[in-house]
Amino acid sequence: EDTNISLWTDHTCVLRSGSALCSANNDAIQNNVVQVSAGNMNTCNLRSDGTVECSRLEAPVWLSLVTAISSWDDHACALKSDSNVECWWDNTYGQIDVPSGLTWVVGISLGSYHSCALKSDKTVECWGDNRWNQSIVPSDLSGVMEISAGWDFTCTLGQTWFVRCWGSSYYGQTNVPSGLTDIIEVSGGLAHTCALKSNNTITCWWRNNRSQVSF
């Protein structure tokens, strides 16, 4: 069975064979779901027909033909089949102001108040909150295979299977451990970062106040 897990501070969602169930949601199991994205007190489900349903951040009624979703604190974004991005809800820091001319997007990831897009040419574009430079993409960044925005930082996985992070490092969450190689997936959280290696082991670093980097 195909299984996907998405979690946040106060709830966890599990997607299995097209059915989504969240631990803090008393609603019935949601069917015909192909992706689930858990944000702060909000969960968005992408249905097989390309529509989106969110528990709190209600999606625009006209939104359709969606292929991927991402949600975090108080905003959400959707990647559409035409490779364009639509975002909605809170815009305090401009996090839903999708840059004009942004096209050929193949992936999206949201931080608390910033949004990032991975383009087909393996470059990255971010917008929104920039108080910790989390939206300033390094000028020499290229060959990106995956992007993951954390609370106030951003990480990418490159073609050479190396991780690169920028933005706030108050807890050291952007300080990628030296010698970390053979990475196949990266994920940024509140103040810690985790990477999955090709040998199916996981390496996490920095803030560990709740044992979030201890295995």
Regions found by a protein language model. Give the residues of each.
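Surface loop/turn motifs at the tips and blade-to-blade linkers of beta-strand repeat domains
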Residues: 29-30, 60-63, 99-101, 138-139, ...
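Intrinsic low-complexity tandem-repeat regions in disordered proteins
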Residues: 11, 33, 51-52, 66, ...
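Consensus positions within tandem repeat domains that build extended binding/scaffold surfaces
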Residues: 9-11, 40-42, 73-75, 90-95, ...
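Residue-level recognition of a conserved intra-blade site in WD40 beta-propeller repeats
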Residues: 7, 15, 38, 46, ...
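Conserved core positions of repeat-based scaffolds
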Residues: 11-14, 22, 42-45, 54, ...
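An edge-strand/N-cap motif at the start of beta-rich repeat modules
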Residues: 1-27, 31-38, 43-45, 52-59, ...
